[in-house]
């Protein structure tokens, strides 16, 4: 007798094994007519029950709201500055490997090492693996659970207790051999398990975008630390150049003092200027060491591991004439934090369905098939057969409001996730607008400081010549020299700031993870 007679062959082949309980005949036993009639009657009942349950399972609804991608505030175009600088942001496809637009081989090499060896990225990958394992645990509920069992024991029952099923009435011990298979499967009529799987998928997407967000931070921090390092080295070079000028002025004042055309005050002021400039160098050396250590940490290396590689001076990486930043409509798909907020909202929506599913009855199909005998020679015979099959139903009746409280909690969490999504999108627009403004303003400041440096250089040469001619005193030379040093350092800092602003812009745009953790292969 086949369990699924009356159901479609597809149902029978896909959803459960075919059991021939009533047509199996042991070679050493005869059929029992009473058993066959009982089996036939029970078989028809099982046919009806199984087919009804399976049809209900396959046509079941899914409780709870379906997730719809939220609509957030959008802008049609990027903001444009009133006074545009030389390098402009353009709405063209953004380079996925944006750090290469600096055309600095050292920066490109360091970035590649960070992608491979950074410990924060490895931690994020570990968290992603945990999320995948958690999803596997949850999705396993969609499938039947099967197990094989087997046992042997020697027993003796009490002769003074309840009826002894062994037939020995407690007079002697007996053996018991038992083995078989068992299976159970929760029929997901209301879609509770499907909603759990949906929430697990969304939670996994949260972890995926968390990894992308960590990657984006590592990329930006590597570029920022490297650019700052080159900026500090250029500032030190400018300081050393000014130190040479100050020493030359000191030597000049000493010669003039020997000739009787200068005073001790001129020499003292020149010496003080030399000492003041020299005092700036230790702080710059310390800052260089800190930045090299910061890069070493990003590479997963011990302190000073990159000192020999990075201690040699190099120019600050320069920005290109045009910076491709993509279209505003691409932002939601590119920024990991927006994708993460959307996934959290998706998971919160699915969890409402899980909470609603708990109000409905749970129906589980369970069964077992095996053999049990007190003599090993009887094990496997027709008379040793044992089986059980049927549905189990669990329906919550009274729980003191716990289920209602859980549902209210899930709905409130969904509202929070929806607001968080809107806030994340709005914050992204503000960050990009601020970075666009900062990128343009930093260029204008750099260009103005470049002109200030040029004019101060002219002023210093003029002051030195006039001092030699006796037209002005040495205070004028020191004043102009101090102004030149200040403007030169400000120019180096502003030039560094332009490159840092571009890194901040790319970080705000959310680009850089596509080529490392693409969507199509990550899961």
Predicted features along the sequence, with ranges:
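Amphipathic alpha-helical coiled-coil scaffold segments and their short linker/junction regions
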Residues: 88-92, 100, 115, 137, ...
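Acidic, low-complexity, intrinsically disordered peripheral segments
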Residues: 302-303, 317-319, 323, 469, ...
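Small/polar, glycine/serine/threonine/aspartate-rich low-complexity segments that form flexible
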Residues: 86-89, 93-102, 151-182, 305-324, ...
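Alpha-helical hairpins and coiled-coil heptad-repeat segments
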Residues: 250-267, 459-477
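Bacterial Sec-pathway N-terminal export signals of envelope proteins
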Residues: 62-135, 316-346, 396-397, 422-425, ...
